[in-house]
């Protein structure tokens, strides 16, 4: 009978324990802290009204067009998902943000394993002890930041794998679009880093017209579809204020 080496046993156990620790830190008493009266509360109202007879494209506050929260609606869909599962509660408001961080830790840990098991565990451990992320406006808050950081990180992971498989450039572009639909112009950082990477590594020289077409479609089509739908509602008003 074959025995499993101890090193093979310990890595998955330690990895699962670290992910479990992050899940505990993210979700434990998630609904205890008061709701921030600024962004968090407003995002909750936006999502609630969207889910209860409002527009899925235009965010509203007190059933009036909201030009204070000038973000595209993807993060509001995350809050709506929480409300659909857990009802209209504070836990539901923050659920998607906490889940995003757990998924972030899982993805980072699995990606880092290519460099070694110790590196994988250290990467997840760092995310567990990064106290700043557990404070206001991110993991334990109904704000867009946690989802944005997840999408940003996935885009960077895909970018680092482009030289292995060029199709990862399309995934990176699509994640840029999702990040834009979450935090608007914050996603520009992905474009800057990705553009420099493609330029400095010489990957752009390998691209043909088909590659450019697919890349631009992945990056721009989701944004353009949302923008067209939003334009039909209130013209250029939202975009002018957003700018």
Question: Where on the chain are the PLM-derived regions?
Answer:
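Transmembrane-lumen/periplasm boundary regions of multi-pass, lipid-linked membrane glycan transferases
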Residues: 43-49, 162, 178, 182, ...
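Loop-to-helix entry region of an early transmembrane alpha helix in multi-pass inner-membrane enzymes
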Residues: 73-77, 86-103, 138
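Transmembrane-helix signature of polytopic, membrane-embedded enzymes
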Residues: 18, 108-130
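Short acidic/glycine- and proline-prone juxtamembrane loop motifs at membrane-interface regions
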Residues: 137-147
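Transmembrane-helix motifs of polytopic, lipid-linked glycan transferases
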Residues: 95-117, 154
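Membrane-interface alpha helices of multi-pass inner-membrane proteins
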Residues: 158, 168-183
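Membrane-interface transmembrane helices that cradle and orient dolichyl/undecaprenyl
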Residues: 2, 114, 153-169
């Amino acid at each position: 009978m074959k025995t499993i080496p101890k090193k093979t046993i310990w890595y998955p156990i330690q990895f699962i324990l670290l992910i479990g620790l992050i899940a505990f830190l993210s979700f434990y008493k998630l609904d205890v802290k008061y709701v921030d009266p600024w962004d968090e509360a407003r995002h909750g109202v936006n999502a609630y009204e969207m889910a209860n007879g409002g527009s899925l494209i235009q965010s509203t506050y007190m059933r009036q067009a909201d030009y204070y929260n000038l973000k595209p609606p993807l993060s509001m869909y995350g809050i709506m998902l929480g409300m659909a599962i857990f009802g209209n509660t504070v836990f539901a408001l923050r659920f998607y943000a906490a889940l995003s961080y757990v998924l972030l830790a899982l993805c980072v840990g699995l990606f880092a394993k290519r460099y070694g098991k110790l590196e994988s565990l250290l990467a997840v451990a760092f995310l567990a002890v990064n106290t700043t992320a557990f404070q206001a406006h991110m993991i334990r808050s109904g704000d867009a930041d946690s989802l944005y950081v997840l999408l940003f990180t996935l885009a960077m992971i895909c970018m680092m794998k482009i030289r292995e498989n060029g199709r990862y450039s399309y995934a990176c572009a699509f994640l840029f679009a999702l990040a834009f639909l979450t935090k608007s112009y914050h996603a520009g950082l992905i474009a800057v880093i990705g553009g420099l990477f493609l330029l400095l590594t010489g990957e752009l020289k390998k691209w043909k017209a088909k590659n450019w077409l697919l890349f631009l479609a992945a990056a721009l089509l989701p944004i353009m579809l949302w923008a067209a739908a939003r334009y039909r509602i209130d013209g250029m008003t939202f975009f002018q204020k957003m700018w």
